[in-house]
């Protein structure tokens, strides 16, 4: 894979301004898939234009879905099929490294008609999918692994799945449950999905349930221990569907304001958001920043920051931003219960620990936690980004010190936020 040229970020002396964050990746791909199988036309606005979304759109084209994109690719009119997918010949879908496309598509295709292969980039072949496949097999799915047991690529023969009692592992990724929930209304009979172990990233399940409701399907949530879904249902087009701004993407700008002492307002997300990652602002507040909430914005004003010791299982993506914010906080910051960092775009616990040490931090990397003690002065270094958009964006915050930083392969942010560095520059002095 070709890499983009390294980007040198010189020290930023001041931060202030307003940023409208692009649409949420989680919401964009969920809404596209449900719009595709719904009855009628859905008009999506503020859709994210990024690699992960393009992989989903290309797959939907291969699966016979008609849609129209606006010139700036942030509006999409999807003509729903009114049913699961149906293909005559084997369709091979390449999904890059998009977990939000791979997992839900796997579940919906298992209960569609035809033969499908799901493939992706080399890293996708290291991201587990076994827990989802096991659950789908309980419902009657025919899925085989083409390389390694428990990992993509996969081949499946779609068929009518019966539903019934299904158990799913909750501890590795909430995307397995999300995928099952989205597919379950298409099963022949009612389903009771039982969670085995602790369910991680519960707020992402709330996003799924909220999105399903906008497409006419309600799910009985039994305190996140089990979920009851009626079978043989049809999704209904949502009409106009506004994709909220991405709360994980907002975290970098909010952190920048907190660190540098200016005032930064992020629009597109606010107190009415359905995304759990807005709770990132609460962590900044606990560290000492001043937070103001509006319906459609979050505003932060910086102040001297102090370290925190917190369970951040509920905000796994935004918690990464706390790891670099910790470089500017007094004391030792501990981020706990984040095992699922290890099964994301890269092993994020190992990657963050390695790069934080390069800038001079004292780091302890546990199996499911990380502690960070900042140095007196950050060290100028080149940050490796591991083809992980969030690593690149997190370490851009180093430039808020008196130390320049070089970000290797900065274009990896294209996965969720192609013009991130341009937006950061717009609020920097």
UniProtKB/Swiss-Prot annotation:
Pfam families recorded: EPSP_synthase (PF00275)
What protein family does this chain belong to? Belongs to the EPSP synthase family.
Q: Which organism is it from?
A: Pseudoalteromonas atlantica (strain T6c / ATCC BAA-1087)
Query: What pathway is this protein said to act in by its record?
Result: Metabolic intermediate biosynthesis; chorismate biosynthesis; chorismate from D-erythrose 4-phosphate and phosphoenolpyruvate: step 6/7
This protein's source sits in the domain of life called Bacteria
Tell me which HAMAP family the record gives. EPSP_synth
Which Gene Ontology CC terms are recorded?
cytoplasm
Give the residue range of the signal peptide: none
The function of this protein is: Catalyzes the transfer of the enolpyruvyl moiety of phosphoenolpyruvate (PEP) to the 5-hydroxyl of shikimate-3-phosphate (S3P) to produce enolpyruvyl shikimate-3-phosphate and inorganic phosphate.
Alphabetic keyword roster: Amino-acid biosynthesis, Aromatic amino acid biosynthesis, Cytoplasm, Transferase
Query: Which EC class is the enzyme in?
Result: transferase
- Which GO BP terms apply? amino acid biosynthetic process; aromatic amino acid family biosynthetic process; chorismate biosynthetic process
State the protein's name: 3-phosphoshikimate 1-carboxyvinyltransferase
Q: Which locations, inside or outside the cell, does it occupy? A: Cytoplasm
């Amino acid at each position: 894979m070709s890499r983009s040229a390294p980007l040198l970020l010189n020290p930023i002396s001041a931060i202030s301004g307003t940023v409208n964050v692009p649409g949420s990746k989680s919401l964009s791909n969920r809404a596209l898939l449900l719009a595709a199988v719904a009855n009628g036309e859905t008009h999506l606005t503020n859709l994210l234009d990024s690699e992960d979304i393009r992989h989903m759109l290309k797959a939907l084209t291969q699966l016979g879905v008609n849609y129209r994109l606006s010139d700036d690719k942030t509006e999409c009119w999807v003509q729903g099929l009114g049913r699961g997918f149906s293909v005559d010949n084997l369709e091979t879908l390449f999904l890059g490294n998009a977990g939000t496309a791979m997992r839900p598509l796997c579940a919906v295709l298992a209960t569609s008609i035809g033969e499908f292969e799901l493939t992706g980039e080399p890293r996708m072949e290291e991201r587990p999918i076994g827990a989802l496949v096991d659950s789908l097999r309980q419902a009657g799915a025919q899925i085989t692994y083409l390389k390694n047991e428990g990992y993509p690529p996969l081949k499946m023969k779609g068929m009518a799945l019966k539903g019934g009692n299904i158990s799913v592992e909750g501890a590795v990724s909430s995307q397995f449950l999300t995928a099952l929930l989205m597919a379950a209304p298409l099963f022949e009979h009612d389903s009771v999905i039982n969670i085995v172990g602790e369910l991680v990233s519960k707020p992402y399940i709330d996003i799924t349930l909220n999105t399903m409701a906008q497409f006419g399907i309600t799910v009985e949530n039994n305190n996140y221990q089990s979920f009851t879904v009626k079978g043989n249902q049809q999704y209904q087009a949502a009409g106009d569907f506004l994709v909220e701004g991405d709360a994980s993407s907002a975290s970098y700008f909010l952190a920048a304001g907190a660190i540098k002492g200016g005032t930064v307002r992020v629009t597109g997300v606010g107190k009415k958001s359905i995304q759990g990652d807005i709770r990132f602002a609460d962590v900044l507040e606990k560290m000492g920043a001043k937070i103001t909430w509006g319906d459609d914005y979050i505003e932060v004003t910086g102040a001297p920051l102090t370290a925190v010791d917190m369970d951040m299982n509920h905000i796994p993506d935004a918690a990464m931003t706390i790891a670099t914010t910790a470089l500017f906080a007094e004391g030792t910051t501990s981020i706990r219960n984040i095992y699922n960092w290890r099964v994301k775009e890269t092993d994020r616990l190992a990657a963050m620990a390695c790069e934080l040490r390069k800038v001079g931090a004292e780091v302890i990397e546990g199996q499911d936690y990380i502690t960070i003690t900042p140095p007196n002065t950050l060290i100028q270094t080149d940050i490796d980004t591991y083809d992980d958009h969030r690593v690149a964006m997190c370490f851009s915050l180093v430039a808020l010190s008196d130390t320049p930083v070089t970000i290797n392969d900065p274009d990896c942010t294209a996965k969720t936020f192609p013009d991130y560095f341009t937006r950061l520059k717009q609020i920097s002095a």
